[in-house]
């Protein structure tokens, strides 16, 4: 309206409509807005007006906009890069991350999704071929050289607390005819397990470093270490490309349907 008016109620009256082939007198409303005053389009007060998010100068977090009410990060499809505490973990290579930002003001809640580019340590995935495993690893950087797991390789768990994951892996390798003994982190050929914190692995993520006969598995939990061994099993034991892996699930809840009526699988395999 050109001039403001005083009103308590707003009435929408449909004077014309198209019945369509079914003869239904329906009307669709895409958007209607009423303001107590004319808003200033140059003043950003709603998260939906924000067009992009930027990374803080120190690279440790995203810069969330200053808006009325409370603004917080409530979603991330790569929490191993940007977690819900708005902490950025430097990835191996450039990563595009989708995040959801929420604005709560009085009794109103607004959300908007943004895509943010987080620069990695390396500009590309290095040399060699990215491991072909399922599910695919989130990050990979290949280095010169290859490594193999042989009968001379030892399993070194140290004080990591990941003995259960190591034992499962040891049993799996034994079923392939490869017997590995327990050892320590001084061995020249070893698979070493390390417990780490504050690297963004969460409950199920992990890191794998392969370098000239030494394979290092790091995780925050036994579950993460176990998933690392599942990736290693798929990669095999011979001529592994030297390199680094950072992996974590995109979603905390995942599932699938298995039709046991048509596909018979032993319980132990499941």
Give each language-model segment a name:
Residues 75, 219, 260:
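Residues on the solvent-exposed faces and adjacent turns
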Residues 11, 98-102, 115, 190-192, ...:
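Beta-strand secondary-structure signal
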Residues 15-17, 158-160, 259-261:
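Short strand-loop junctions, especially beta-strand C-caps/beta-turns
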Residues 117-249:
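Acidic, contiguous N-terminal accessory segments
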Residues 1-39:
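Aromatic, loop-rich ligand-recognition surfaces of beta-strand-rich domains
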Residues 38-126:
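Beta-rich interaction/scaffold domains
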Residues 16-18, 103-107, 221:
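Surface-exposed loop/turn motifs at beta-strand-loop junctions within extracellular Ig-like
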Residues 243-269:
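An acidic-aromatic substrate-binding cleft motif
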């Amino acid at each position: 309206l050109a001039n403001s008016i005083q009103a308590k109620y707003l009435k929408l009256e449909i004077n014309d409509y198209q019945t369509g082939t079914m003869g239904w007198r329906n009307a669709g409303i895409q958007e209607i807005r009423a303001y107590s005053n004319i808003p200033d389009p140059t003043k950003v007060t709603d998260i939906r007006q924000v067009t992009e998010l930027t990374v803080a100068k120190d690279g440790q977090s995203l810069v969330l906009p200053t808006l009325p009410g409370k603004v917080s990060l409530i979603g991330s499809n790569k929490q191993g890069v940007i977690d819900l505490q708005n902490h950025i973990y430097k990835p191996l290579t450039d990563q595009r991350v989708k995040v959801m930002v929420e604005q709560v003001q009085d009794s109103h809640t607004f959300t908007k999704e943004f895509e943010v580019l987080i620069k990695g340590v390396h500009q590309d995935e290095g040399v060699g071929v990215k491991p072909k495993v399922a599910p695919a690893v989130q990050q990979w950087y290949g280095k010169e050289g290859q490594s193999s797991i042989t009968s001379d390789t030892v399993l070194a768990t140290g004080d990591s607390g990941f003995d259960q994951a190591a034992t499962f892996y040891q049993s799996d390798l034994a079923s392939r005819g490869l017997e590995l003994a327990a050892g320590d982190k001084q061995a020249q050929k070893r698979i070493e397990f390390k417990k780490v914190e504050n690297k963004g692995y969460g409950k199920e993520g992990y890191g794998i470093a392969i370098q000239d006969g030494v394979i290092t598995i790091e995780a925050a939990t036994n579950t993460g270490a176990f998933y690392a061994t599942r990736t290693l099993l798929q990669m095999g034991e011979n001529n592994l490309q030297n390199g680094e892996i950072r992996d974590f699930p995109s979603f905390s809840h995942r599932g699938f349907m298995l039709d046991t009526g048509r596909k018979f699988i032993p319980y132990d395999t499941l």
